[in-house]
Amino acid sequence: MNFLLCIFKGVYVIKLIQRFFKLESAGGILLLFSAVVAMLLANSPLSNQYNDFLNLPVSLQIGSFSINKTLIHWINDGFMAVFFVLVGMEVKKELFEGALSTYQQAIFPAIAAIGGMVIPAVVYWFIAKQDPSLANGWAIPMATDIAFALGIMALLSKQVPLPLKIFLLALAIIDDLGAIVVIALFFSHGLSVQALIFSAVAIIVLILLNRFRVSALCAYMVVGAILWASVLKSGVHATLAGVIIGFSIPLKGKKGERPLDDFEHILASWSSFVILPLFAFANAGVSFAGIDVNMISSPLLLAIASGLIIGKPVGIFGFSYISVKLGLAKLPDGINFKQIFAVAVLCGIGFTMSMFLASLAFDANAGESVNTLSRLGILLGSTVSAILGYLFLKQTTKLN
């Protein structure tokens, strides 16, 4: 009897887990859970073990070629490159077939995204300009965490109109494109010509695979792995390889199959339930030891938090409103400016993307206090934006 009861409980738990992973908000919830666990570990008696685990040396060697990184660097440079493969595929799909496929569809979220990148950077610069050592952090509040923002919106999925969801997705995708450009232009150092040549050859092979509409995903994975390793060695940030790989996968194969859709379907679950939660676990572990009230007035913390809480909504809403009034763009049917403002606030959730940019802007040499304060600023700004964004979205969709 007890044995049957255990089996029944086991089946019930499995069904609950399956039901959870089918939720639209499951990725966002898991992301938040991972961040909370990381913060708890970083401020517990297990903090040393947590940090030692993240700094475990991990090496990959094939003949004379080797990559030696700590575990956290493998997560940030390797796993996040896989995430950017997914981003690249999503951007390509939207550009050719989706919400960004026509000028009329693309211009409104594009202008909004530009405002959402420029104004947060200006807000950051205005607050942090007194300290030249903080100059590199201007890009941190530019980013939007797609998974988290969509996760919050999914909590109100039945109330939110479809055009508003499409606007958020298009806005976040263009935002990611901006982040990719920033990484390429400002966070690539000490370039290796030899590695860049290998990268160029790999890119040419990917272009040929795409040109001949090769559907075998293993071919893109093998060449993509070579491209990633070459880009990593070149001094350009390795996540850019992910975007190139994503763009190289064809929308349609020779026999009408859809390799991009197939690969996107595979990676979407890995990204939501493994890669992003793992990234949050590795990067959200902020230790509060030695932190006092005076740190709240730190220019770095204030600059990042203000960029996310104030800069994002002001930039997105302001540019959107002005573009419509000047006749440069048209407000999508079925949504109003109050809802645009709610989404603009929601886009202040920088979280994993902002932490990623912070890890590039301030390396280990910047000092523990700088890294801690930057992560605190991101957590504060993202948390406030998530709460306010949810409340505004709930109110505006309810009124609608």
Swiss-Prot record:
It catalyses: Na(+)(in) + 2 H(+)(out) = Na(+)(out) + 2 H(+)(in). InterPro entries: Na/H_antiporter_dom_sf, NhaA. Keywords: Antiport, Cell inner membrane, Cell membrane, Ion transport, Membrane, Sodium, Sodium transport, Transmembrane, Transmembrane helix, Transport. GO terms for cellular component: plasma membrane. Pfam families: Na_H_antiport_1. Gene3D superfamilies: Na+/H+ antiporter like domain. GO terms for molecular function: sodium:proton antiporter activity. Signal peptide: none annotated. It is found in: Cell inner membrane. The chain crosses the membrane at residues 26-46, 71-91, 107-127, 137-157, 166-186, 189-209, 225-245, 273-293, 299-319, 340-360, 373-393. Its main location: membrane. Coiled coil: none annotated. It comes from the Bacteria. It is a multi-pass membrane protein. GO terms for biological process: regulation of pH. PANTHER family: NA(+)_H(+) ANTIPORTER NHAA, SODIUM ION/PROTON ANTIPORTER NHAA-RELATED. Belongs to the NhaA Na(+)/H(+) (TC 2.A.33) antiporter family. Na(+)/H(+) antiporter that extrudes sodium in exchange for external protons. This is Na(+)/H(+) antiporter NhaA.
